[in-house]
Every structure is written in structure tokens, then in C-alpha cells.
Design a protein with these regions (language model features):
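PP2C/PPM-type serine/threonine phosphatase catalytic domain
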Residues: 1-282
Length: 282
């Protein structure tokens, strides 16, 4: 299979800082997205630390299988999924320790959604309310579960999905990186097929753009970066209430070759204002 990918991050229409962060590591077929929280730029610190830690741990463990695993990892999982879950556990540890060690960073945290592809095998690791979707044969399937208060209330039948969309508690998370010394990491393993499309996104997209609109955009635009740009533009057109980050991954017929594009609507973390963004490793 041939894989094409692209990512876009934008500050939105309301916020002044971008606390989202993402990274595409093309040679490793690794995609990582994080949405920081904590205010006063500390959300940016948390999301950047999450993405950096997960990426480095996956790289290290791929090169050296003796790299120790962190956290509780199911024995039945593939080695790749174990390494990815371990990376997220380590990211939680790093963020928690950073917050505990710096008074001004107390309370910072982050979501984390990562996808790692090896041939036709997909590993997903997830904490928080950023999402991973799979579009297959015109049907959009959410691969992750939101770790938010309203999502839990919907699962328990306390409120309806429609009520959740109107709730003022949508931003309240019940699970995030850095909140506790240990975190439960959701993992998924899937088999991919030619013409599958994956999308990772922060809640700045899913709170503004409907799933049918997401699916329609992915089907209409074959260039992954332009698809991501169009989804970000839709979120901003509908109000841009939050930072919005989108990674699109297309599995296409052909030789196993990488084509990756990256554009950012927000300035990179290297810029003077420290706003969020993304990075492509190719």
C-alpha cells in the first residue's frame, strides 16, 4: 500500500494561543496529536511534551527492542501496540512530574491520540477527548471513546447525545495525561485496507463540524493536506471556538511509499509567541 498523509493546526477564531500539537513521523508511519490544557501557555508545554515523549519512545523502542516498557500493558497486544501504549504511559509520567516540579505549571495536562501503522496493522493509543476516525466504504467510524464527563453521562444513560452537544460541561475531562501519577490508556488494534482513510483530530474540529461533514470532505478531497485544510476552514467558518488540529492519512493502491505534506495555520512552537503547531519528519 501507498500512504499519503498531511496535517494542519490552527489557533481558531477565539483563542490567542494554540495549545494543540502534532507530529507526523513518515519513516516510522507514526502519527501523534495532543491538545494541551492548563492556561497561561502551560497547555502548550503539556501537549509539546506529550508529543515529544511519545515520538521519542516509539523511535527508541523500534530501534532497540530492549527499551523498557512503562505502565500496565496487556500481554496479548502486538509488540508495536505495547510500545505505543508504553510511550503514552511515559508521557503521562513526564507531564505529571513537570507539573509537580514547577508551581506555575500545576494543573497542566493534555489529551493524546496516536496511530502507528505497520503494513496493514494499525495500533491506536488514546487518552482524553481528541479522536481517531476510520472512513471505510463511505462509513465513518469513531475508533476512540471520549474521556469526558458528558460522554460518560451519555454512556450511563444520564443524558442523551443531543443533550451532551448542548452541555456547558463538554470541556470537562475525566481522564487526561498529567492529571495523576498513573493513567489508563485505551488501545485499539485494527487491520487496514486499501482506500481506508484515517483522521486524528482535536475537539476543536468535532465540536464545530458534524461527522457527515467530516466524511463528505474526506471523500471529496483526495489530497490529505487539502482535506485537513478544508476541515479546519469549516471549523473556523462555524465559529472557530477552539484550536483545531487535523491529521489525514490515506491508504492507496501502489508501492509502499510515503508522500507527506504539512501546512500549519498557526505559527510553530519555534516562533516567538510559542503557539502550537505540527512537525513532519520525513
Amino acid at each position: 500500500m501507498q500512504i499519503a498523509s498531511g496535517g494542519v493546526s490552527d489557533v481558531g477564531r477565539i483563542r490567542t494561543d494554540n495549545e494543540d500539537c502534532f507530529r507526523i513521523v513518515a519513516p516510522l508511519q507514526l502519527f501523534v496529536l495532543s491538545d494541551g490544557m492548563g492556561g497561561e501557555a502551560h497547555g502548550e508545554v503539556a501537549s509539546a511534551l506529550a508529543v515529544e515523549t511519545v515520538t521519542k519512545h516509539c523511535l527508541d523502542s523500534r530501534e532497540n527492542h530492549a527499551t523498557p516498557l512503562f505502565g500496565e500493558v496487556q500481554a496479548s497486544l502486538s509488540d508495536q501496540t505495547k510500545r505505543l501504549a508504553s510511550a503514552v504511559h511515559l508521557a503521562n509520567k513526564r507531564i505529571f512530574e513537570a507539573a509537580e516540579g514547577h508551581l506555575e505549571q500545576r494543573g497542566m495536562g493534555a489529551t493524546l491520540t496516536a496511530a502507528w501503522i505497520d503494513g496493514a496493522k494499525l495500533s491506536i493509543a488514546h487518552v482524553g477527548d481528541s479522536r481517531a476516525y476510520l472512513l471505510r466504504s463511505g462509513t465513518l467510524q469513531q475508533l476512540t471513546s471520549d474521556h469526558s464527563l458528558v460522554a460518560e453521562q451519555v454512556r450511563r444513560g444520564i443524558i442523551t447525545a443531543a443533550e451532551a452537544e448542548e452541555s456547558q460541561m463538554q470541556s470537562v475531562l475525566i481522564r487526561a495525561l498529567g492529571a495523576q501519577p498513573e493513567v489508563e490508556v485505551d488501545v485499539e488494534e485494527h487491520t487496514l485496507f486499501v482506500r481506508d482513510i484515517l483522521i486524528l483530530c482535536s475537539d476543536g474540529l468535532t465540536r464545530m463540524v458534524t461527522e457527515p461533514e467530516i466524511a463528505g470532505t474526506l471523500q471529496a478531497e483526495t489530497n490529505p493536506t487539502r482535506a485537513a485544510e478544508k476541515l479546519v476552514a469549516l471549523a473556523n467558518e462555524y465559529g472557530g471556538a477552539d484550536n483545531v488540529t487535523v491529521i489525514v492519512i490515506r491508504l492507496e493502491p501502489g508501492s509502499r511509499k510515503w508522500f507527506s505534506w504539512l501546512r500549519r495555520g498557526a505559527r510553530s512552537k519555534a516562533a516567538s509567541n510559542g503557539s502550537g503547531g505540527g512537525k513532519l519528519d520525513g
